[in-house]
Amino acid sequence: MPKMKSVKGAVKRFKVKKNGTIKRGSAFRSHILTKMSQKRKRNLRGPKTVHSTNVAGILSTLCKA
């Protein structure tokens, strides 16, 4: 049987924490931020966690399921 290969784009975007939750970054934070309010930019700051309904799919792309 061939080796399981992880999706390289998913490896770069997600990190699995010790308690099993998955850490992700926020979208819409790269450029053209002048038209966005300070409150919206502040809420997009920092790492977020993946919702529980998406965890199984992401773990399978990372070959950790």
Curated annotation (Swiss-Prot):
InterPro entries reported in the protein's UniProt record: Ribosomal_bL35 (IPR001706), Ribosomal_bL35-like (IPR021137), Ribosomal_bL35_CS (IPR018265), Ribosomal_bL35_sf (IPR037229)
Specify the superkingdom: Bacteria
Q: Which UniProt keywords apply?
A: Ribonucleoprotein, Ribosomal protein
Gene Ontology annotations for the cellular component aspect, listed alphabetically: cytosolic large ribosomal subunit
The UniProt GO MF terms for this protein read: structural constituent of ribosome
Please list the disulfide bridges.
none
Question: Mind listing the GO biological process terms from this record?
Answer: translation
Q: Which Pfam families match?
A: Ribosomal_L35p
Q: Which family does it belong to?
A: Belongs to the bacterial ribosomal protein bL35 family.
PANTHER family, alphabetized: 54S RIBOSOMAL PROTEIN BL35M, LARGE RIBOSOMAL SUBUNIT PROTEIN BL35M
In Swiss-Prot or TrEMBL terms, this protein is called: Large ribosomal subunit protein bL35
Which gene is the coding source of this polypeptide chain?
A: rpmI
